[in-house]
Every structure is written in structure tokens, then in C-alpha cells.
């Protein structure tokens, strides 16, 4: 009987990131598909699913292979999205690429969230198949709530008349945090709030300075849990995500599911998926953001949330669970075919 080990080694470090949320989504997807899973390596299982690139995940994959189990490795990270992140990340990017290549090749199959990230990984010369499959979104859980909106605005002292711009992510340059702060300076009539956190030792000096910016309309409250973040989506007038590089961006799926208008950067991962002026608004830099942001907030541009919600339904947890089941079946079908060929020799 099929059973999956969702290995959670490294989650103490990655649990507050998109990888942590991705693991939650995988568990829900397997549950919806009726596929048994466990987080306990001591239980019986025949597939291990790995999500981090810490040494313990590589070790777990190698151990599972030695025991004849199948290994599914999620390619959440690329060299490209490692750059412009933590202190020293640009200097270490080449080493990071070699390391993640070693990790990913320990799997029987590599799953990565988008066709864009699959194309990137395929340029690394990986010797294992790479499959594009969204991290997914639990549409039953992510529902816009008037009560949640009220809680959020009361908690952060936003009046009903003020427009609120929401940002979510680590305190890293890649997430576009510098542009977020700059827009807060340009538009004092709007409130800006960014949820997320990063250990201070890993934050580059210019990002640390940006987060300490003192403006009456700018807040950095730190990390919040899923429920409070859903309240924030419900109570915000715009999700501003000026990220410079993503493999998908789970927060993008969350905002679309919560029917919060989205303004993001026009980057390759969203080409052919998120259409400017149809599902989201996209800008190339501060000049575009400065023009689009007030037009969205003041209703001078059409509200796109209905079309965005229709699109994000393609990323539903139910569909992701069915797709995972197909990937698992393919792994064992290959094993049976190889066994049959050996018997014929």
C-alpha cells in the first residue's frame, strides 16, 4: 500500500517561509487524494518527499534510496532566487547551485512549482526528470472574511477610510522590500504594512536600514501565523508584491484566493500565467509602481479579483493531490517495467 513520508527535517529553520507553507499544502493535497502520509521516519512508507536542501534532507533521501524506497525531491530553490537574499548570498550563489544540484539528483523525480523554475533547473544539467507542479492553494481555507478584515484593521489601528497596502515575505532585497518602503514614502495618504521576518544576522545592512525606516504610514510587525495573515488579506486594499525573482510565490496564490487586488513585478515566472490588466497588475520598477498603485487603490483601474480567483482555481489542492498521485504511480510503473525487462534478459 502506498504511503508517503513528508520529511520535515529543517522545518525549524524553513517553517516560517514559503517552503513551510508548501509542506502544509502537500499534506492537504495528499489528504484530499486519499493518500496516506506520515511525518515519522520510523513508520513504514514507500515514498519520501523532501522539501529543504539542508544536509539532513540529503541524508534522508540517500538512506531511503538504499532501502529501496522512492524519493521525490521538491525543487523550491534555485541559484537565481538565492541571489539578493541573505548576507553573502551573491558570493555563495555558485556553491549553492552545486549543492542544490547534488540534493535534487538524489531524488527519483524533481518537482518544482512552475514551468519557469523547471526551465531553470533543466539548465543545471540535472540527470533526473523535472516536473512542473504548483504548490497549490487550499481554496476551502483561504476565504475572504469581513470579520477577519475588521480584526486586522482594529489590531493595527487602520481606520475604515484609509487604504491599506500589504506586503509579505522575508526581509531580503529579492522580495522587493526596498521598493515597498519607497512607495510608502511617495504615498503618505496610504498605509503600508509588511509581514515577515528574517534572523538579524542574515539581513544585509541596507535592508536592515529600510526595515527601520520611521514613517507614520509604514509598519513591519514581523511574522504572523496563517489565520492572522488571512485577516490581513481580507482587510487590505492591495497586495503589493514587488519581488525580483520567484519559483512561484505562494503568497501570490493566497492573495488571489482571498480576492485581494494584486500589484507585482513583471518577472519571467509570471509570463504566460498572470496577464497584466486581466488577473493582476504588473510593473517593471518604481516608476510603474508609482503610477499603478494609486490608480488601483482609487478605483481608476478595473478590479481584477474575480478573474484572478477563476485562474487560481487551477491551482486548487484537489487538483494538486490528483497530480501527485499520478507522479507516484509513474515512479512505480517505471520500477515494474525495469523489473520485467530484467526478467526477460
Regions found by a protein language model. Name each.
Residues 244:
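Aromatic "clamp/platform" in nucleotide-sugar-dependent glycosyltransferases that forms part
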Residues 104, 223-224, 231-236:
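Short alpha-helical donor nucleotide-sugar binding micro-motif in glycosyltransferases
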Residues 168, 191-206:
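Glycosyltransferase donor-sugar binding loop
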Residues 276-287, 294-300:
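Conserved acidic donor-binding segment of nucleotide-sugar-dependent glycosyltransferases
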Residues 205-227:
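Nucleotide-activated donor-binding/catalytic signature segment of Leloir-type glycosyltransferases, i.e.
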Residues 158-175, 181-185, 193:
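Conserved donor-binding/catalytic core segment of Leloir-type glycosyltransferases
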Residues 261-264:
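Short hydrophobic beta-strand element within catalytic cores of glycosyltransferases
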Residues 91-110:
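Membrane-proximal helix-turn-helix segments that form the acceptor-binding/catalytic region
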Amino acid at each position: 500500500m502506498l504511503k508517503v513520508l513528508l520529511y520535515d527535517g529543517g522545518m525549524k529553520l524553513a517553517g516560517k517561509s514559503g517552503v513551510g507553507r508548501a509542506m502544509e499544502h502537500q499534506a492537504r493535497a495528499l489528504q484530499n487524494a486519499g493518500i496516506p502520509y506520515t511525518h515519522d521516519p520510523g513508520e513504514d512508507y514507500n515514498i519520501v518527499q523532501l522539501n529543504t536542501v539542508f544536509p539532513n534532507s540529503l541524508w534522508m533521501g540517500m538512506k531511503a534510496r538504499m532501502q529501496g524506497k522512492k524519493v521525490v525531491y521538491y525543487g523550491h530553490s534555485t541559484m537565481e532566487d538565492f541571489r539578493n537574499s541573505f548576507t553573502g548570498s551573491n558570493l555563495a550563489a555558485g556553491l549553492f547551485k552545486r549543492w542544490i544540484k547534488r540534493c535534487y539528483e538524489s531524488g527519483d523525480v524533481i518537482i518544482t512549482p512552475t514551468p519557469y523554475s523547471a526551465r531553470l533547473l533543466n539548465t543545471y544539467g540535472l540527470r533526473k526528470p523535472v516536473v512542473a507542479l504548483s504548490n497549490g492553494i487550499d481554496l476551502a481555507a483561504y476565504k475572504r472574511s469581513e470579520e477577519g478584515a475588521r480584526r486586522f484593521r482594529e489590531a493595527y489601528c487602520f481606520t475604515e477610510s484609509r487604504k491599506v497596502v500589504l506586503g509579505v515575505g522575508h526581509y531580503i532585497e529579492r522580495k522587493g522590500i526596498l521598493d515597498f518602503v519607497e512607495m510608502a514614502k511617495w504615498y503618505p495618504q496610504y498605509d503600508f504594512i509588511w509581514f515577515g521576518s528574517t534572523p538579524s544576522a542574515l539581513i544585509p545592512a541596507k535592508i536592515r536600514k529600510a526595515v527601520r525606516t520611521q514613517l507614520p504610514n509604514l509598519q513591519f510587525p514581523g511574522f504572523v501565523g496563517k489565520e492572522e495573515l488571512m485577516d490581513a488579506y481580507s482587510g487590505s486594499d492591495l497586495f503589493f508584491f514587488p519581488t525580483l525573482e520567484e519559483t512561484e510565490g505562494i503568497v501570490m496564490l493566497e492573495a488571489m484566493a482571498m480576492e485581494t487586488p494584486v500589484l507585482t513585478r513583471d518577472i519571467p515566472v509570471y509570463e504566460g500565467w498572470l496577464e497584466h490588466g486581466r488577473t493582476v497588475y504588473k510593473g517593471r520598477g518604481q516608476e510603474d509602481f508609482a503610477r499603478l498603485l494609486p490608480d488601483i487603490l482609487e478605483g481608476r483601474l478595473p478590479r481584477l479579483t474575480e478573474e484572478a480567483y477563476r485562474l487560481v482555481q487551477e491551482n486548487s489542492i484537489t487538483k494538486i493531490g490528483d497530480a501527485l498521485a499520478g507522479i507516484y504511480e509513474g515512479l512505480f510503473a517505471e520500477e515494474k517495467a525495469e523489473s520485467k525487462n530484467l526478467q526477460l534478459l
